[in-house]
A protein has these predicted regions:
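Short, intrinsically disordered, mixed-charge
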Residues: 53-64, 99-102, 106
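Non-catalytic terminal extensions that flank enzyme cores
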Residues: 1-38, 143-147
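Generic alpha-helix signal with a bias toward terminal, lower-confidence helices
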Residues: 19-21, 42-46, 60-63, 83, ...
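Active-site-adjacent, His/Asp/Glu-enriched structural segments that form or flank metal-binding
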Residues: 73-143
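Active/ligand-binding-proximal structured segments within catalytic/core domains
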Residues: 27-61, 70-71
Length: 148
């Protein structure tokens, strides 16, 4: 059986950051690495789930909404994948992502999609935890200026 592309990445060398993970046709998969892999530090489910709700909503309502294909968590709980059409340059993606992270920090209302009708596990959401994670990731993004 062929090994999938994500297993070909040497996770012992990954640091928190923002990377181009792969390109498939006109879709760029960005690795939004919040935690260093295999250190025992991971995002808990409430944090990941809430970040997913918030960032997915903000990105799909941004100026690049038509180019956002997907945003969701990594199974290893160390970050997220953001899939965007290649017509949007990485620098612009990071700029819009920073805005979405900041908007999450400023959110004072309810978590988007926080009802039984909208979400299959709506009780597992915590805006405070998501704000903490997004604030920490914004610090990581300050040092990002290359994407490979």
């Amino acid at each position: 059986m062929q090994r999938i592309k994500s297993f070909e990445v040497d996770h012992t060398k990954l640091e928190p950051g923002f990377y181009i993970s792969r390109i498939d046709g006109d879709v760029v998969t960005y690795d939004m690495r919040f935690c260093k892999p295999n250190t025992g530090v991971v995002l808990d489910n409430e944090t990941m789930h809430t970040v997913e709700h918030m960032i997915a909503t903000f990105m799909r309502n941004s100026e690049i909404a038509d180019s956002v294909v997907y945003f969701g968590p990594m199974g290893c709980q160390t970050g997220f994948y953001l899939l965007v059409r290649d017509s949007i340059k990485p620098e612009r993606v990071v700029e819009v992502l920073r805005g979405a992270l900041n908007d999450t920090l400023l959110q004072n209302g309810a978590v988007f999609g926080a009802s039984a009708v909208e979400c299959g596990n709506y009780r597992s959401l915590d805006l405070g935890k998501a704000k903490t994670a997004c604030g920490e990731y914004l610090k990581i993004l300050k040092g990002v200026n290359k994407y490979q």
